[in-house]
């Protein structure tokens, strides 16, 4: 049980450091393993590629903020449900990020993103 909680805290810290604090190189140094496998079709494999991507993204969207709504862990996987906004007035995007950890380090990543619509077919939120 302690390992699951540690993995959740690792993912929370990684997302916060890389995107909200705008320090992706620091996040990679602290929380990513020597191999980083990327399944996002817009991002290449490798820790250095992630740093370049996140640095460019932060430059393009300096007000980017990720609100972590929930984090779930099972085995070596951690799933984070996120609200991602590019600027404060933005409705944002709902994100589901899946991380695989090995020895308390992030080694693999998948994600699915969906814009938050102006109107929904129900009265529920995406969060």
Language model: regions and residue ranges:
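C-terminal and inter-domain tail/linker signature
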Residues: 1-127
